[in-house]
């Protein structure tokens, strides 16, 4: 059975922390592919600083060297707010027999019960969680306790051994705006940022 990982984010910009956790996601779950899904109009986050077209281009450039990585614009071309459940449904229709895995950080896990149709979502996809520094499963809201306990036991939720890197896109944007420093950004994406004058003051 084909295993497909889905990795949504604003990627504003994509950085080495994203690539590191995507590789760990692929390695630990044994995925055939990881599909990066830059958001169009994300419901749970503030507006991005770069356009959707620029963020998509940067992700395509940054992921080109790993054959397991693919990029989809399905969240960008949809109008209005994009919800994870709707995105997963698109991939379920495309790959009806595949095992789907959705990657999220532990901060998102703690809010999962507030997501649109979350109980239907977790029936359609498995969940891989990258823990952020300082987070613990003991902090999980009580609304998720029964589901999480069962899902950890049956393997439909996996906690990755690789932690989420403590890299902030906000900090990277600040460095780019203030000093033009592109540390932590994949070289191909850094070149694109310079060539297109992104994140300048």
From Swiss-Prot:
PANTHER family: NICOTINATE-NUCLEOTIDE ADENYLYLTRANSFERASE-RELATED (PTHR39321), PHOSPHOPANTETHEINE ADENYLYLTRANSFERASE (PTHR39321:SF3). This is Probable nicotinate-nucleotide adenylyltransferase. It comes from Neisseria meningitidis serogroup B (strain ATCC BAA-335 / MC58). Transmembrane segments: none annotated. Its EC number is 2.7.7.18. One of its GO terms (biological process) is NAD biosynthetic process. Keywords: ATP-binding, NAD, Nucleotide-binding, Nucleotidyltransferase, Pyridine nucleotide biosynthesis, Transferase. NCBIfam families: cyt_tran_rel (TIGR00125), nicotinate (nicotinamide) nucleotide adenylyltransferase (TIGR00482), PRK00071.1-3 (NF000840). The keyword Glycosyltransferase does not apply. InterPro entries: Cyt_trans-like, NadD/NMNAT, Rossmann-like_a/b/a_fold. The lineage of its organism: Bacteria, Pseudomonadati, Pseudomonadota, Betaproteobacteria, Neisseriales. Catalyzes the reversible adenylation of nicotinate mononucleotide (NaMN) to nicotinic acid adenine dinucleotide (NaAD). CDD domains: NMNAT. Pathway: Cofactor biosynthesis; NAD(+) biosynthesis; deamido-NAD(+) from nicotinate D-ribonucleotide: step 1/1. It catalyses: nicotinate beta-D-ribonucleotide + ATP + H(+) = deamido-NAD(+) + diphosphate. Belongs to the NadD family. One of its GO terms (molecular function) is ATP binding.
